């Protein structure tokens, strides 16, 4: 398994993308998480869309001095294009609340809750959202054998883009005693549900639609599959019976609204083979905006082009008092 590294960045890099416009948008991306590369790809498209829509845009590759840089440029709005730690986990929203700068996407509670797979699972179950059975394993437990019956999924507590996720099948040459806990001292071990991978895009509390992921190469929807062209096929809209499709959208809206999310989000489900039972996997409060990303694709199918999507997200910008 490839390990995606985090790295500390002292100084934020600033680049003026457009010096004229109706409002000044600080596009914050990059940063110090393992999802840095995806964030930068998302920001490239978002930056072009903001310029096309007529905004003054300053790109900030976030470092430890982000507060100083924001104070210097004094933006009207921050477009939070960070993925992973420091941005998607509620850190940047918390800072912007203190600075009283409006920002896109969810606030501190929704962001931090969604990013932590253990606490978000508790939230889902409390709100009667169906999920696969799971347990938490700590490095100190010194587990030497499979913690549950195969097949099962290993998930880090706090990573996105399927970073660190592994699926252990019956035939795999895998010894849990050798697992090195690359993304923290605790992991979730989840029962593997064989079924159809479904994704729902939500904008401002309403589900836009759903698509199905058909794997073409890898065994599950991992980081490589998500961001490499030709590794998966997207079926939009998801070819489902009407009752299941409607339930999928309704459950997604329930998750989004009970968590008090804001702007755009993406919710992942598995539709189990044989039973047609829906299992929620997670909600992503900072969905990707890359050329292969799901939310822009679903939005486009429903008549919202990329520039309009970015403007709709921008309209929701606010800070929490």
UniProtKB/Swiss-Prot annotation:
Annotated compartments: Cytoplasm
Enzyme class: ligase
Entry cofactors: Mg(2+); Mn(2+)
Principal subcellular localisation of the protein: cytoplasm
An example Gene Ontology molecular-function term: metal ion binding
EC numbers: 6.3.2.4
Entry-linked InterPro entries: ATP-grasp (IPR011761), ATP_grasp_subdomain_1 (IPR013815), D-Ala_lig_Van_CS (IPR000291), D_ala_D_ala (IPR005905), Dala_Dala_lig_C (IPR011095), Dala_Dala_lig_N (IPR011127), PreATP-grasp_dom_sf (IPR016185)
Positions annotated to bind Mg(2+) 2: 282, 284
Residues engaged in binding ATP: 148-199
Reactions listed under catalytic activity: 2 D-alanine + ATP = D-alanyl-D-alanine + ADP + phosphate + H(+)
Official protein name in the record: D-alanine--D-alanine ligase
Organism (species): Rickettsia bellii (strain RML369-C)
Classification of source organism: Bacteria, Pseudomonadati, Pseudomonadota, Alphaproteobacteria, Rickettsiales
């Amino acid at each position: 398994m490839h390990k995606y590294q985090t790295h500390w960045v002292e100084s934020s890099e600033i680049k003026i993308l457009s010096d004229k416009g109706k409002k000044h948008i600080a596009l914050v991306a990059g940063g110090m998480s393992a999802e840095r590369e995806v964030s930068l790809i998302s920001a490239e498209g978002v930056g072009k869309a903001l310029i096309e829509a007529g905004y003054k845009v300053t790109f900030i590759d976030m470092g430890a001095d982000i507060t100083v840089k924001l104070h210097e440029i004094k933006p009207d709005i921050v477009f939070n294009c960070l993925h992973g730690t420091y941005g998607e986990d509620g850190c940047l929203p918390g800072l912007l609340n203190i600075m009283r700068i409006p920002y896109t996407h969810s606030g501190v509670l929704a962001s931090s809750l969604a990013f932590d797979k253990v606490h978000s699972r508790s939230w889902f179950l409390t709100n009667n959202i169906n999920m696969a059975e799971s347990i938490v394993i700590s490095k100190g437990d010194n587990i030497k054998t499979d913690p549950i019956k195969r097949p099962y999924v290993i998930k880090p507590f706090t990573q996105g883009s399927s970073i660190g996720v592994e699926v252990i099948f019956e035939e795999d040459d895998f010894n849990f005693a050798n697992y090195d806990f690359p993304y923290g001292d605790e992991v979730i071990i989840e029962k593997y549900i064989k079924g159809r991978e479904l994704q729902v895009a939500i904008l401002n509390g309403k589900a836009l639609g759903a698509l199905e992921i058909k794997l073409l190469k890898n065994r599950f929807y991992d980081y490589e599959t998500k961001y490499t062209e030709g590794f998966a096929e997207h079926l939009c809209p998801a070819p489902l019976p009407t009752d299941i499709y409607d339930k999928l959208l309704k459950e997604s809206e329930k998750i989004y609204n009970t968590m008090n999310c804001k702007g755009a989000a993406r919710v992942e489900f598995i539709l189990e083979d044989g039973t047609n039972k829906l299992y929620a996997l997670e909600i992503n409060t900072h969905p990707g905006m890359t050329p292969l990303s799901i939310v822009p694709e679903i939005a486009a199918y429903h008549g919202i082009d990329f520039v309009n999507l970015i403007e709709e997200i921008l309209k929701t910008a606010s800070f929490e008092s």
